């Protein structure tokens, strides 16, 4: 069963967790040595030096690798102009390095300030110089509102991917994926996955994250959480959704072993490329 599921899934993306540029380099070297080629950089603070992190990735990676740099409208107060500048900068770096660079536009957690809505970014999303994705939560109480918000983001035609919030209400997920595939068949879909570890479960029991829909079964322990995670991945495979491995992060060999157990071993990495 596990082998069949791994074979049906697309190779996972890995969200990068680090505190310093040196640690970022170490993560990239360990993960590429293990065969992983696609990564995400998270924007959690207005002081995040995102383009400097992208430069580190471009130094360590090469053609065939790709990096998605998140852009939080909460932490980038100039809205559309700031996003347009980011997209142009990524396009230039991608051309110079051969690394495929893209952006995931998110609103950020907590209450949004005036001007921090996707509609204010419409100009930058109309014809972006580098690929842009937007977020979608298939577990919202008001899905009509969530669908309408997504349709507004996609109206300009410049968005190429939709990124799904993590959760385990699988009937809701299946329903929304059916709608997404019927309504926007050309879009790439990426779905979040949490690693079912003791650390993650303890974290979510103590202080659950806003908008994350987890069940009592999932929170009952690592074995149950892994079982539910495999059911989630089966839904992703059914709808050709690419997984994104998020919390609590792939930081150690033990974390990497959990990823391999869920997804199988990645393709052998090519020899190291230096540009």
Regions found by a protein language model. Give the residues of each.
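Active-site beta->alpha loop and helix N-cap motifs at the rims of alpha/beta catalytic domains
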Residues: 2-148, 156-159, 216-230, 237-242, ...
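C-terminal helical cap(s) of enzyme catalytic domains, especially alpha/beta-barrels
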Residues: 173-180, 252-274
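Short, conserved beta-strand edge motifs with alternating hydrophobic and charged residues
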Residues: 133-135, 161-165, 189-194
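Short, hinge-like loop/turn segments at secondary-structure boundaries
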Residues: 86-88, 180-181, 206-210, 262
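Short acidic/glycine-rich loop or secondary-structure boundary segments that cap or lie
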Residues: 141-143, 170-175, 197-202
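Glycine-rich beta-alpha junction loops
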Residues: 168, 193-199, 249-251
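Catalytic-face loop-and-helix region of soluble metabolic enzyme cores
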Residues: 188-241
């Amino acid at each position: 069963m596990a082998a069949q599921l791994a074979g049906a899934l697309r190779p996972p993306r890995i969200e990068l967790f680090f505190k310093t540029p040196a640690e970022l380099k170490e993560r990239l070297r360990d993960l590429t040595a293990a065969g992983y080629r696609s990564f995400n950089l998270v924007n959690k603070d207005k002081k995040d030096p995102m383009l400097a992190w992208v430069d580190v990735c471009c130094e360590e990676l090469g053609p065939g690798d790709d990096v998605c740099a998140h852009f939080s409208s909460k932490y980038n107060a100039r809205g559309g102009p700031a996003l347009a500048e980011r997209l142009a900068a990524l396009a230039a770096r991608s051309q110079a390095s051969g690394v495929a660079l893209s952006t995931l536009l998110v609103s950020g957690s907590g209450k949004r300030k005036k001007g921090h809505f996707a509609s204010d970014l419409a100009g930058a999303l109309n014809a972006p110089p580098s690929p842009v994705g937007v977020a979608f939560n298939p577990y919202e109480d008001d899905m009509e509102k969530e669908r309408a918000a997504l349709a507004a983001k996609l109206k300009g035609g410049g968005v190429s991917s939709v990124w799904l919030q993590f959760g385990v209400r699988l009937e809701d997920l299946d329903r929304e994926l059916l709608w997404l595939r019927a309504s926007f068949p050309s879009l790439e879909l990426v779905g979040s996955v949490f690693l079912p570890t003791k650390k993650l479960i303890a974290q979510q029991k103590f202080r659950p994250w806003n908008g994350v829909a987890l069940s009592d079964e999932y929170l009952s322990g690592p074995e149950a959480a892994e079982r539910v995670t495999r059911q989630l991945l089966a839904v992703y495979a059914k709808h050709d959704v690419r997984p994104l491995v998020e919390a609590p992060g792939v930081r150690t060999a033990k974390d990497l072993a959990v990823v391999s157990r869920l997804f199988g071993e990645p393709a052998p990495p090519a020899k190291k490329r230096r540009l």
